[in-house]
Amino acid sequence: MTNSIASTKCLPNALSTGNYGMSQSHRYTDDSKEYIIVKLTDSAFRAIEEYQRDDNAKRLQPGQRAKIQFVGNTGVIQFPRPATDANGIPNANGNGSDATGAGGGGGRKFGFTINNMEGTLECVQQQQRSLGVLGAVTLRMRIHANEDVYDSTRTKMAIAEETEKSKCIREIKPNQSDIGRKVKKPPSAIQSSASTASAFSSNSSNSGLTTTAFHHHSNSNNSGNNNNRSSSSSNSFNSNNHSRKLGSSPFNGLGVGSSSSSSAFASRSPNPSTLGAIGTVNGSGVVGGRYGGGAASSLASTFANGISQGYHNLSGSSPRDSMTAGTSSATASSVISSRNKMPSGGLTSSNSNSSSSSRSANSKSSGGNKMSDVSRRNIRERLIHLLALKAFKKPELFARLKNEGIRDRERNQITNILMDISTMSHNTYNLRRQMWNDVDENWPFFSEQEVQQLKRRKPQNLTPPMSSDAGSSTSGQSPTSTHTGSPPPPSSNGGPGGVGSGAGGTSMKRTSLEYDETMFSTVQPKKQRISHYKKDTPPSGTSYSSAGVSMSLGSSGSSSRSRYTPPQRQPGPLDDHSTTDLSYNVLDNIVEFMSSTAAATQQSMEQQQHPRSNSSNNRRGSSSLAGTSNGGNNKDKRNSTGSNSSSSSGYETQQDRQRSTTPMSSNRSSASSSTTPPKLAASFVPAATSGSASGTSKQRMPPQQSDYNSYNSNNAQHVASNSKKRMGSVGPSGGSNGQRQRSASGSNSGYQQVPPPSSNSRSSIQQQNQHQKQQVQQKQAPSQQQQQQQQQYHQQAKHPSPSQQLAAAAHAYAHATADTDSSATPRYDFSQYVPIQTLEVRRRYKTEFESDYDEYRKLLTRVEDVRNRFQDLSERLESARRCDNGYGDYDHIKRQIVCEYERINNDRTIGEDKERFDYLHAKLAHIKQLVMDYDKTLMSATMAMAPTDVVAAQGPDPAVAKAAARLAEHHRRQHHAAETIKQQQQQKQTHQHHLQRHLQHHLQQQQNLLQQQQNLLQQQSVSNSDDSSDSSDSNDDDDDDDEDCDDSNSNTDDDEARY
């Protein structure tokens, strides 16, 4: 390493942009040198510069020059003290020992530490025409701070603290006895009050006579000279001013009135912009180095009870008399007394003891005591209240805590506490929502500005979750928030000696506690509006009340939400119906454009036809909703009846939802068998349509399931009878709506819906009723045929054999999927999935379908494995029964089926997977059916809009037709893809089945061969025993044995050929 240490200097700008390039011709590095990047402190940098400027340094002995010494990864750099300092003044001790050094051989010593670099750098040297690479920089040297740095920092902090303590204002109360002295003024001072004030300020700063409050001027020349000296000395005094104490000087009781006198006193007062925190003056402007009259009057007015006029005349009465006058209540303004050192030689106060005592009193009542108090608080509380004000970056947070005071052990806890109470985004810490409960608005260390800032931030982060207008744009204000356009709420000076901030303000401020109590006592937070309206449920044929008809006919231009009972379950991602997520990617933008175009066209049509009747229709529709459905009962009129065109008309109760579930089951069972796919329809087919079918289905069900179905059937009969009794309270319009019938029969659970706004006439509704009746009649015929087939099957299976029972059990479990009979009772309640009315609901349904489909596929694979295992056992049992040769294969397979059945029944995981599979199967089928129904409705509505008269007058819209065509093509592709996947799965299953059958046939042949060989061995043993018993016929037996052997060999040959 080189002995010379060069200072960092900027290289000349010899290279301009665009006129040079970088190319590496050769790379020469000197391995004998090691390059280190050095980070200097200010004192070390100054020491290097002083050493370079010292001419005597070159003539020093080698032992007295600058030295650097390495001790492992640490070391010391020593510089000899120069003979002269930076100003050319010779040092007293020369190269001797320095007070700030480390002792020893004199000069200055700096310790350092060497660490490895995190990255790799290269040291480059600029030459005449090129840049030379000297080598890689792999080490970093950090110079340690010396003791003189700590001393200078300690001195600066002491000066700053003294300056901060001196910036305070003392409040003089009217009942104090030591306000000031009573001084009589000469009559000549009455005419020249302004000149007297200026002369007073000059005399108080330049003369040594301070025994009286107002100096008696014997001649005018002296006063003129003093005025001249005042103008020059005040400017110099203000330029060098650091702090001015507001002590108890002899002029404490003087009131401030006119502009000239206020400017004279303000020239001695500190700059208000440098005063901060509690108990200081903020917001006053400085014009030409002095305050204006408004600032002085506001300073005076904040000490009294809203005084509007100052102390205009300095003569006639003393400051004490002016304070005790009563009516004018002139305020006592603190007059700033100068410090000891003055440009003219110094001002000696005759009341030094009182000044020192007042200084100590002011230092105790200033903000320094608050800072010490906040440092004693828990660091977690301090961080919570700081983050409640605004989002802090980590350096800002550490700087704030360092200024307020922090312990060393608390410094190590800050990172963990921040991770617990805040979230980090964009390198800033934001307070968590749940931590706002720990924020105290009456935190004693907040300033008035911070209290207002907290009140503005808190409503944004603590909006009540049950508020009805939490998501609306008009709920931005809260009882505790402060609107930007309104004046700030009044607040008072809470701390000792505190003065309100505002120039020229004349009203006293209240505390934030009074403000909060006033606002909370007058304005109560909104509560959720609960509608106690109960809608009567009509029978299955008319599952649509008259409210829907009145709403659809009266307020066709309004958008009404579907009313349904929220399910009793944990809130999921679909509970928040007000959120709009753009990441669903279910529909293309053209579909949204189509819907918005159709809505805009319909709205313009309705505005042209009914420009003035929309609001009245809305009110009439809502009133008919409350009148006709309640049957004239007026006790449930608490629901909102005016302006409900864009809000739901209330929630149903849980009992209403149960009542509306079962009466519509017959229509849903017939409709769902044709509208849903064959494989998916049976999993959510409603209750049985006849008693015989339900009775036969109970024979094959477990006892729990049969009890469940019997309970549902009894409940359905009970509710149906109750609904017939309630028919009288429903108006004639309740049975004239066929659109609700179609939607209710096409759905798969008991719920109620409000159809989309439309302008259908009564004739179209009657046509829909007729069409619905025809569909019900057509769908009842296949269900009757299925019931007859089931009856025949059960009559044949009245007395099955045990083998038939085992085969039936294995076959039933192998086919125990969604292919249940149509008379099965729905076990799941999907009432929360209402029919789709908007594209947003369709997106949510499609998203939930996609999220559950992966789990459904996994469960399907597990169920298929169990089903395939039982199917193989069933086929093996059937084949063993057909070719029963008495070898025990049939009994072995039967025992295997029983063992497998018991294992699956005892395995809880398989049962849970099967139940979850059935639920997802029914749920996905239900959602798919709702989406298909909405798409069909949308297509029909789009096609029906074209031949209308209004559209004919305006001309056809090609965008709508194109969007409809794209939507149809999109659904066709989806259906084709689903069918393709289904075919591939079926082919795969068929192929696996054929392979399994081939393997089973091969194993069966091997077992037959082994059995034949065993039979041959048994026959041979029998023949050998015959030879030993009968010796006389041995020759014949030998011949017979040979023939038998030939026969056996021929049989084995035949068997081997067959194998």
UniProtKB/Swiss-Prot annotation:
GO biological process, one term: cellular response to heat
Composition-biased stretches (Basic residues): 990-1001
Annotated Acidic residues bias: 1027-1059
Statement: the UniProt record of this protein carries the keyword Membrane: no
GO cellular component, one term: nucleolus
Comp. bias intervals (Low complexity): 188-241, 258-273, 322-369, 467-485, 543-562, 612-624, 640-650, 660-697, 759-795, 807-824, 1002-1026
Record's compositionally biased regions (Gly residues): 494-505
Keywords: Chromosome, Coiled coil, Nucleus, Transcription, Transcription regulation
Coiled coil, from the record: 853-883
Domain OCEL: 827-939
GO MF entries: chromatin binding; cis-regulatory region sequence-specific DNA binding; RNA polymerase binding
Region (Disordered): 171-277, 314-374, 450-509, 522-581, 598-827, 968-1059
A Pfam family assignment: ELL
InterPro entries: E3_ELL-like, ELL/occludin, ELL_N, Occludin_ELL, WH_DNA-bd_sf
Compartment list: Nucleus; Nucleus, Nucleolus; Chromosome
Compositional bias (Polar residues): 598-611, 698-707, 738-751
Subunit structure as annotated in this protein's UniProt entry: Component of the super elongation complex (SEC), at least composed of Ell, Cdk9, cyclin-T (CycT), lilli and ear. Component of the little elongation complex, at least composed of Ell, Eaf, Ice1 and Ice2. Associates with RNA polymerase II.
Family, per entry: Belongs to the ELL/occludin family.
Role played: Elongation factor component of the super elongation complex (SEC), a complex required to increase the catalytic rate of RNA polymerase II transcription by suppressing transient pausing by the polymerase at multiple sites along the DNA. Elongation factor component of the little elongation complex (LEC), a complex required to regulate small nuclear RNA (snRNA) gene transcription by RNA polymerase II and III.
Protein name listed in UniProt: RNA polymerase II elongation factor Ell
Organism: Drosophila melanogaster (Fruit fly)
Record lineage: Eukaryota, Metazoa, Ecdysozoa, Arthropoda, Hexapoda
